Curated annotation (Swiss-Prot):
Keyword Coiled coil: yes
Keywords for this protein: Coiled coil, Cytoplasm, Initiation factor, Protein biosynthesis
Positions of the UniProt region annotated as Disordered: 1-64, 77-101
GO molecular function (one): translation initiation factor activity
Top-level division of the source organism's lineage: Eukaryota
Pfam families: eIF3_subunit
Name listed for the protein in its UniProt record: Eukaryotic translation initiation factor 3 subunit J
Organism ancestry: Eukaryota, Metazoa, Cnidaria, Anthozoa, Hexacorallia
One Gene Ontology CC term in the entry: eukaryotic 48S preinitiation complex
Subunit structure: Component of the eukaryotic translation initiation factor 3 (eIF-3) complex.
Function field: Component of the eukaryotic translation initiation factor 3 (eIF-3) complex, which is involved in protein synthesis of a specialized repertoire of mRNAs and, together with other initiation factors, stimulates binding of mRNA and methionyl-tRNAi to the 40S ribosome. The eIF-3 complex specifically targets and initiates translation of a subset of mRNAs involved in cell proliferation.
Subcellular location: Cytoplasm
Natural source organism: Nematostella vectensis
Amino acid sequence: MADWDDEKFEPGEVPADGVTDKWEGEDEDDDIKESWDDDDEDEKKEDEAKNTEAAAPKKKKTLKQILKEKEEQKLLEEKRKAEEKQKLEEEDKELTPEEQMAEKLRRQKIVEESDLLVAMDTFGVGTQEEASRTGLDSMIPSTKEEFTEYSKLLVEKLTKFETNPEYIPFLEATLREICVSLDPEDIKKLSSTLNMLQSEKLKAQKGKKAKSKATKKATLTGGAKMGRKDEMDYSYGDLGNEYDDFM
C-alpha cells in the first residue's frame, strides 16, 4: 500500500485512433447530399431546356430564303451537269461517230427528263406514278361517303372516253363482268335504275322534239302571213299613188 502511495499513478495515453466520435462523418454526408441536390438541379435544368427547344415552333422560311435555296440548288445542279458533260466529252474521244450520235441522243433524253422533273417540282405537279398513288388506286372505300367519292372519280375517269365508238361495248362488257357475282335481286335493282334512267331520257327527248316542232311551225306560219301581206302591198300599192296624182 505504501508502495502505491509512493508511486505516482499516471494513466496511459489513449491512442487517437482508438477514439470514435459518434458524430464523426455527419458533415461529410451533408456535403454528399448537397452535391446530389446540385446534380438533380442540373438535370432538371437540362430537361427544361430540351423541352423548351422541342416546344418552340419551327420558324417558317421566308420567300427570300426559299428563293436563295432554289438558286443554290440550281447552281449545284449546273455545276454537276458541267462536270458530267466534261467527263462525257473525254469519253467521246474513244467512240466512233455512230456511237457518239447515239450517246448524244441518250444524253439529250436524260437532260429533257431532268428538266421536266425540275419544272414539275417547281410548279408543284406530281408525276403520273404519284398521281396514281393519290387517286383511285390508293382509295379503299368502306363508308357510304367514301364510295360516293370513289364513284365521282371513277365516272370522271371513264366519261373522258364516251365519244369513242368502243365506249358502249366496253360498258356492256364491264357491267356484265361486275354483275356476274351479284344476286338476282341486286341485278334487278340495277336494271330498274337503268330503266328509270331510260324513261327519263326518252321523256326529255320527246319534249325537246315537240318544242322544236312548235317553234318551227310558228316560224312557217308567220312567214306565210308576211308573204301574203307583202304580195298584197306589191299588187295594190300603186293604186294609192295613182289616186294622189289624180287629185
